Design a protein with these regions (language model features):
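Short conserved beta-strand segments at catalytic cores or DNA/RNA-binding microdomains
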Residues: 59, 72, 76-93
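Active-site beta-loop-alpha junctions of metal-dependent nucleic acid enzymes
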Residues: 73-77, 94-118
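Short, well-ordered secondary-structure micro-motifs
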Residues: 79, 134-137, 159
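Acidic/histidine-rich, metal-coordinating catalytic segments
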Residues: 119-134, 152
Length: 191
């Protein structure tokens, strides 16, 4: 099992073999950061609909048209790229945005979703980030119902979190994401 392999590598004594094996891991990290619960200091998003009232057929991943979304932020949170992953097919869209504001997210996600056929625009699951404060406008513009995950629960959007980790190979943390054109982002999404 994959977890056994990771545990065996992390249990090795410090040395050249351990370094070489860690480089081969998917994230290339020498240890895992322990997760702990924290206090939610963000304000509530108005009129948000919880993931717990989301129809069960979305969870089954049998019907296309249900998306998971997130925002990848660049250096000093000044630039950002929106990510949308279709839950059934794994189809990925990267959306260039001016910044990480609610207005940019609303405009970017609305434009990206409206490029898709109506049959594959049913719902989107998102975290409780401030950039989704204008979720009602996205729903109005696209017809996509938006559901919000519980705070500090990234596993409720597992496909998107996994994809974001893979995208970071091409768009590393701490870099200016505004230098990438939409065409470059489309190429990254295709890979």
């Amino acid at each position: 099992c994959r977890e056994t392999i990771y545990n065996a590598i992390y249990a090795l004594p410090v040395g050249e073999l351990r370094k070489e094996l860690i480089i081969c891991l998917r994230q290339g990290k020498s240890s895992r950061r322990p997760r702990s619960g924290g206090v939610d200091r963000r304000g509530q998003i108005p009129d948000m609909v919880s993931i717990h009232v989301r129809p069960p057929e979305i969870e089954d991943r049998l019907m296309p048209g249900h998306w998971e979304g997130d925002l990848i932020k660049g250096k000093a949170n000044a630039s950002s790229v929106g990510t949308l992953v279709e839950r059934t097919s794994g189809y990925l869209m990267l959306v260039k945005m001016r910044d990480a504001t609610a207005t940019s997210a609303m405009e970017g996600f609305s434009a990206a979703l409206n490029r898709m056929p109506l049959a594959v625009r049913k719902s989107m699951t998102y975290d409780q980030g401030r950039e989704m404060a204008k979720h009602a406008e996205i729903t109005q513009n696209t017809g996509v119902a938006i559901y919000f995950c519980d705070p500090h629960s990234p596993w409720q959007r597992g496909s998107n979190e996994n994809i974001n980790g893979l995208i970071r190979q091409f768009l590393p943390k701490g870099t200016d994401l505004s230098v990438h054109s939409q065409e470059q982002l489309d190429e990254i999404a295709y890979l």
